[in-house]
């Protein structure tokens, strides 16, 4: 978030437009805070949860050029590409697509910014799915990706292993533009508000990102979880992405209107019957519009995150068992409403309550089936 704030402060002004494959919550908040707007330019496959298209995070090249022509290159300070696109199910882009984005950017003299927070996992899926790179190491793939960007920024908690983040560039002009903002907002250039201990841990974590044995553990477990839940009929985002298995709450909770937050309700129901914490990625994660109306999400997902080197396979199987039961009893799930709604990033700190007594009915059915087991 600190990196996003620095970049937005440096480049975004009122009227700026940032084309991207898809937004992330804090990215959108920072851009709008500085007066900019976002243009999301996925191909249709990116929103089709049942499509087996391998690179749903690809940016729509024709729409990108059309957007630049319509709004003017002078109003577009950079094009943002997110690795392992988070909010559509951790879906990767291909290097070929990034090359095409780079070519358009060069044509109109616009910079390319790569959100590399989930770079290692995107590289691993390129290794598996993009024929040209099947014999490349993760390090070679990551270099090919970063060579196509002017600026690379990341959350170390996602890419590496520690608190903090970073902004990288091999362009001295860009470095000089960003340089004075670091001590203003974070700390001196040599540490940026991060302790030396955390920087050392970050360096180790970045090297580990090049280790296929380490980086593949999470995607492999996620693929197992997606396939196992799919075998039970649970609607999932396919093909399996990274970061977590993503459950299609729009389909499971079709009886819940989007303004009652079906993904949030499904996550709450899962926690009640299992203690499993899923993350809502849908309308609840969006900001209201300028008139106070809900901004309905393109997708309603519950992310079942699978961190690296944390879970055993038996724990993944427990998730399958409880999620499968909940799917069979999905009609018992009801909606949610806010009792406290912060004006920004409401899903972090807001408070909600059920719109009816559906939690009691759900738990009564669970106890009838399982006894007092939780």
Summary of predicted features, one role per range:
Residues 1-236, 257:
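Conserved PLP-enzyme active-site core in the AAT-like
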């Amino acid at each position: 978030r600190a990196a996003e704030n620095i970049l937005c402060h440096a480049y975004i002004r009122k009227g700026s437009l940032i084309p991207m494959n898809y937004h992330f919550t804090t990215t959108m908040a920072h851009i709008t805070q500085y007066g900019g707007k976002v243009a999301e330019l996925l191909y249709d496959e990116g929103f089709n949860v049942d499509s087996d298209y391998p690179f749903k995070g690809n940016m729509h090249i024709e729409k990108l050029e059309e957007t630049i022509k319509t709004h003017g290159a002078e109003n577009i300070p950079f094009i943002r590409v997110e690795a392992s696109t988070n909010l559509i199910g951790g879906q990767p882009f291909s290097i070929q697509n990034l090359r095409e984005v780079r070519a358009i950017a060069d044509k109109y003299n616009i910079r390319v910014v790569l959100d590399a927070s989930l770079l290692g996992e995107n590289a691993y899926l390129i290794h598996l799915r993009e024929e040209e790179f099947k014999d490349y190491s993760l390090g070679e793939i990551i270099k090919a990706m970063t060579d196509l960007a002017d600026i690379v920024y990341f959350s170390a908690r996602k890419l590496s292993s520690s608190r903090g983040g970073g902004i990288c560039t091999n362009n001295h002009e860009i470095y000089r533009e960003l340089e004075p903002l670091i001590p203003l907002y974070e700390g001196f250039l040599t540490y940026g508000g991060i302790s030396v201990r955390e920087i050392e841990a970050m360096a180790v974590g970045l090297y580990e990102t090049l280790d296929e044995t380490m980086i593949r553990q999470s995607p492999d477990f996620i693929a197992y979880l997606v396939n196992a839940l799919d075998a039970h009929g649970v609607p999932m985002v396919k093909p399996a992405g990274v970061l977590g298995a993503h459950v299609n709450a729009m389909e499971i909770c079709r009886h819940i209107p989007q303004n009652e937050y079906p993904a949030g309700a499904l996550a709450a129901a899962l926690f009640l019957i299992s203690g499993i914490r899923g993350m809502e990625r849908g309308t609840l994660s969006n900001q209201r519009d300028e008139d106070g109306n809900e901004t309905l999400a393109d997708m309603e997902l519950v992310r079942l995150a699978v961190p690296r080197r944390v879970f055993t396979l038996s724990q993944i199987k427990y998730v399958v068992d409880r999620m499968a039961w909940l799917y069979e009893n999905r009609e018992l799930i009801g909606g949610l409403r806010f009792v406290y709604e912060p004006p920004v990033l409401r899903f972090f700190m807001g408070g909600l309550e059920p719109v009816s007594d559906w939690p009691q009915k759900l738990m009564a059915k669970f106890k009838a089936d399982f006894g007092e087991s939780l």
